[in-house]
Amino acid sequence: MVYAAGSVRDIPVRALRLCGLTWTGQSLWYSDAMNDEIVALDPASGEVLRRIPCPGVRTDLTATGGNLVQVAGEHRALRTIDPDSGQTVGVRGNPRPGHVLCGLEATRHGLWTGYEDLRVIDLRDPEDLRLITTFQTRRPVAGVTASDRYLAYADYRGATINLIDLDDGAEVLSVTVHGNPTGIAWDGTLIWYCDFATFQLRAIEVPGIAGS
């Protein structure tokens, strides 16, 4: 099914290369590869709450165990950062070395890693990165998020956000959005995305995903 969604909330941000996006329960965090930083903001007011320097920002961002995890560096490693101190507390290698890791999301299921070149999203054990399962995607993966029932990924060039049913791995919905989505995040009601084209964080409502 194909569906077109207009944004219900737009937040302009001071960023030149919007990459990653994650929701921590109260704040949206986004990463900017041009300014090499990770930024927290209040989605209600748009107020910036914190800026953390992060050299080598590449693509997506997630939060787990009270820390942030950013895809960073030439080899797209998983860099774990303490959001309070801004210090790097750990680095793990790209689970598929040499491939284009773009999407990253930590959920109760495990750690999701999405690859643009392979068109796959892997679910991995967050402790040792052991592969649990793999979902094939129809489009290149730019960013990843998940609810309890659905896995969602962004296609930057196709300007779509696509939903996969976690029960059977079928792609059930393709949502056409404004701009070019990169990082995406689900806040329990809305799917937010980084619009690379207009330097904004934008939110859409997707039928059937709210509360899922």
Protein language model features and the residues they cover:
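Blade/loop signatures of beta-propeller domains
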Residues: 1-4
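A short beta-strand motif characteristic of beta-propeller blades
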Residues: 6-12, 47-52, 87-94, 127-135, ...
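Beta-rich, blade/repeat-based domains predominating
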Residues: 12-24, 55-65, 95-108, 114-115, ...
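Conserved beta-strand positions in repeat-built beta-propeller and related beta-rich domains
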Residues: 30-35, 70-75, 112-117, 153-157, ...
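WD40 beta-propeller blade core
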Residues: 39, 79, 119-122, 162, ...
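Short loop/turn segments that connect beta-strands within beta-propeller blades
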Residues: 42-46, 82-86, 123-127, 165-169, ...
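Ankyrin-repeat and related helical/solenoid repeat scaffolds used for protein-protein interactions
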Residues: 147-191
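Blade-level signature of beta-propeller repeat domains, shared across WD40, Kelch, NHL, RCC1
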Residues: 181-212
